């Protein structure tokens, strides 16, 4: 009898939830906010779909959302920062519409979390960019110069990102993924941890400081580096392209493959390998 009661309670809750979803007003509404306001920092959360368009002529925010979300919208501007999210946690139906399009001349700080999907459109003329992705957020596109500090956490993903500037710092952890083009005329710093993965499509830099650990994988064969210091450890793998000096360590059942004809000064333990890149090992 007790099992039957639990069964009917579960069925009742499922039916109640289904009825509530059917009662939601899914009409798509549109709203324009902050026309002409300067926006240089954007924070988004709660699984919003956010498109950021580089627009030198006008600045505003377009919202497209399901009508039932009206009372929960939390889209505010505090100084130069735009915040996009909801006022409370919502268990949303799969067909819920929650899109934001931000037109702005330049951005200096981006913070995406809680499964936000972001798209960057255009060349952004910021002197410095700080960008962080958390909680399985994803970001695609965008072109930046100057200096950039990028951090990806908690299985976040960044693809088709283009940096062509002075200095770039990139940190990935917790199975995060980066794919993009990197050129830094001064230097770059790249660190991967906890099964993260990085692949570059091209680029150059005179100096690169690289760390790859905890079953992570780095492929920079298409980015030409003059001098690189790299530490590969804890069952990780790195593929690099170095023309000058290659220094560092390879430890803990790890592998380092290199392209080019560098001067090598790398300490390698007995369980790890360092060898030239060839068709047989890549």
What annotation goes with each model-predicted range?
Residues 120, 128, 138-139, 157-158, ...:
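Short stretches within intrinsically disordered, low-complexity N-terminal or propeptide regions
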Residues 161, 178-282:
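Short, surface-exposed interaction patches in beta-rich subdomains
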Residues 1-30:
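Bacterial Sec-dependent N-terminal signal peptides
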Residues 19-132, 140-151, 159-169, 186-189, ...:
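Acidic (Asp/Glu) and glycine-rich low-complexity loops/linkers
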Residues 114, 134-135, 153-154, 173-174, ...:
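Asp/Glu-rich intrinsically disordered low-complexity tracts
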């Amino acid at each position: 009898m007790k099992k039957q009661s639990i069964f009917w309670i579960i069925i009742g809750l499922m039916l109640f939830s289904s009825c509530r979803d059917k009662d939601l007003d899914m009409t798509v509404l549109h709203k324009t906010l902050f026309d002409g306001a300067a926006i240089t920092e954007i924070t988004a959360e709660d699984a919003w779909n956010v498109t950021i368009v580089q627009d030198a002529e006008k600045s505003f925010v377009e919202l497209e959302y399901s009508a039932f979300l009206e009372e929960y919208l939390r889209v505010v501007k505090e100084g130069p920062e735009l915040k996009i999210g909801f006022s409370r946690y919502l268990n949303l139906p799969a067909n819920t519409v929650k899109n934001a399009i931000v037109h702005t001349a330049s951005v200096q700080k981006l913070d995406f979390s809680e499964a936000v999907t972001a798209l960057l459109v255009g060349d952004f003329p910021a002197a410095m960019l700080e960008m962080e992705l958390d909680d399985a957020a994803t970001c695609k596109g965008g072109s930046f110069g100057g200096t950039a500090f990028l951090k990806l956490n908690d299985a976040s993903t960044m693809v088709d990102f283009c940096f062509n500037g002075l200095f770039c710092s990139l940190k990935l952890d917790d199975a995060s993924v980066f794919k993009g083009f990197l050129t830094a005329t001064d230097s770059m710093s790249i660190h991967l941890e906890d099964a993260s993965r990085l692949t570059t499509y091209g680029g150059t830099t005179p100096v690169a400081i690289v760390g790859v650990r905890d079953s992570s994988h780095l492929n920079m064969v298409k980015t030409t580096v003059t001098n690189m210091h790299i530490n590969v450890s804890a069952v990780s793998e790195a593929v690099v392209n170095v023309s000058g000096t290659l220094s560092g360590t390879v430890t803990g059942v790890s592998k380092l493959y290199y392209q080019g004809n560098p001067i090598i000064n790398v300490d390698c333990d007995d369980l790890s390998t360092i060898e030239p890149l060839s068709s047989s090992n890549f």
